[in-house]
C-alpha cells in the first residue's frame, strides 16, 4: 500500500484544502477536503479498473461515519466464524445513519477475498441511484486515520447543525445560525435548508462585518411597507 498527502489552498469558487491518495490492492482512493459557498465537505473517491465511485460527506456526516468505523476496527482482523471463507458476501456488522436529511449505511462485510467496508449514501431523489464505495480490509485503518486527522484539522467550526444551533423556520425553509472560528478568524455561517428537498445553501459572514450586516437588516425591516 502506498500513499501520499499534500495540502493546498487555491482561491477559486471551490477551494481544495487538502488531499490524500492511497493504493489498496488494485484500487486507488482519494480523500479530499474542499470548501465552497455551502461550506466544507469531504469527498472520498474509489478508482478501480474501468470504474469510479465516490461519496460526498458534510463535516457532520463524516464525523458520524468515522465514529462508526472506529467501532468496527477491532473486527477487521478477526478470523472467519465458519470453516471456510464465504462464497458470497456476508454481513458482519451494519449501522444506519440519518444525517443532513440523508441516510447512510456503514457495513463491514466479508467475501472470498476477505473483509471489506462498504459506505453507501442514499440519494435525496428516489429516482437517482445510491453512491457507495468499498474499502478492502488493508485500507480501512489508513482511511480512518486520514479522516480523523482531517476532521481534527479542518472540521472545527464547520459542523452544520447541532441541538444548540439557533434555528428559524418559515415558508418551507429552515435557517440555521452557527458561529465558529477557523484560521481566517471568527465568523457566523447562515445556512438555508429547503424542507421539501433537503437542498442546502450557506453564506459566511465575518464577525468584523456582523454589526454592519445587522444595520442593513434593521433598515430593511424599518422600511417594510413604506
From Swiss-Prot:
Its BP terms in the Gene Ontology are: germ cell development; regulation of locomotion; regulation of transcription by RNA polymerase II
What GO molecular function terms would the record report?
A: DNA-binding transcription factor activity, RNA polymerase II-specific; double-stranded DNA binding; double-stranded telomeric DNA binding; purine-rich negative regulatory element binding; RNA polymerase II transcription regulatory region sequence-specific DNA binding; sequence-specific DNA binding
InterPro entries membership: PUR-bd_fam (IPR006628)
Question: Keywords, A to Z?
Answer: Activator, Chromosome, DNA-binding, Nucleus, Transcription, Transcription regulation
UniProt subcellular location: Nucleus; Chromosome
> Which Gene Ontology cellular component terms are annotated?
chromosome; nucleus; P granule
Question: Chief location of this protein?
Answer: nucleus
- Domain of life, per UniProt, equals Eukaryota
Q: Which Pfam families match?
A: PurA (PF04845)
Loss of this gene results in the following:
Sterile due to lack of oocytes. Defective locomotion, marked by a 3-fold reduction in speed. RNAi-mediated knockdown causes embryonic lethality. RNAi-mediated knockdown substantially reduces expression of end-1. RNAi-mediated knockdown abolishes formation of endoderm in 3% of embryos and in 35% of embryos on a mom-5 mutant background.
Query: Does the record bear Transcription regulation in its keywords?
Result: yes
Q: What does this protein do?
A: Probable transcription activator. Binds telomeric DNA containing repeats of the sequence, 5'-TTAGGC-3'. Binds to end-1 promoter, activating end-1 expression, which is required for endoderm specification during embryonic development.
Q: Which family does it belong to?
A: Belongs to the PUR DNA-binding protein family.
The name on file for this protein is Transcriptional activator plp-1
Amino acid at each position: 500500500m502506498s500513499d501520499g498527502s499534500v495540502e493546498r489552498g487555491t482561491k477559486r469558487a471551490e477551494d481544495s484544502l487538502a488531499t490524500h491518495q492511497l493504493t489498496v490492492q488494485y484500487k486507488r482512493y482519494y480523500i479530499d477536503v474542499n470548501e465552497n459557498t455551502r461550506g466544507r465537505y469531504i469527498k472520498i473517491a474509489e478508482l478501480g479498473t474501468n470504474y469510479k465511485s465516490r461519496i460526498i460527506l458534510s463535516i457532520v456526516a463524516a464525523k458520524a461515519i468515522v465514529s462508526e468505523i472506529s467501532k468496527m476496527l477491532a473486527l477487521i482482523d478477526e478470523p472467519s466464524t465458519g470453516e471456510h471463507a464465504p462464497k458470497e458476501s456476508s454481513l458482519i456488522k451494519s449501522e444506519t445513519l440519518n444525517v443532513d436529511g440523508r441516510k447512510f449505511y456503514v457495513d463491514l462485510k466479508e467475501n472470498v477475498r476477505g473483509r471489506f467496508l462498504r459506505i453507501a449514501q442514499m440519494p435525496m431523489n428516489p429516482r437517482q441511484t445510491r453512491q457507495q464505495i468499498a474499502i478492502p480490509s488493508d485500507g480501512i485503518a489508513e482511511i480512518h486515520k486520514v479522516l480523523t486527522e482531517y476532521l481534527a484539522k479542518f472540521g472545527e467550526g464547520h459542523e452544520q447543525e447541532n441541538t444548540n444551533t439557533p434555528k428559524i423556520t418559515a415558508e418551507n425553509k429552515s435557517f440555521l445560525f452557527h458561529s465558529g472560528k477557523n484560521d481566517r478568524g471568527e465568523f457566523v455561517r447562515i445556512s438555508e435548508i429547503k424542507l421539501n428537498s433537503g437542498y442546502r445553501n450557506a453564506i459566511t459572514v465575518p464577525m468584523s462585518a456582523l454589526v454592519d450586516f445587522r444595520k442593513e437588516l434593521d433598515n430593511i425591516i424599518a422600511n417594510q411597507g413604506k
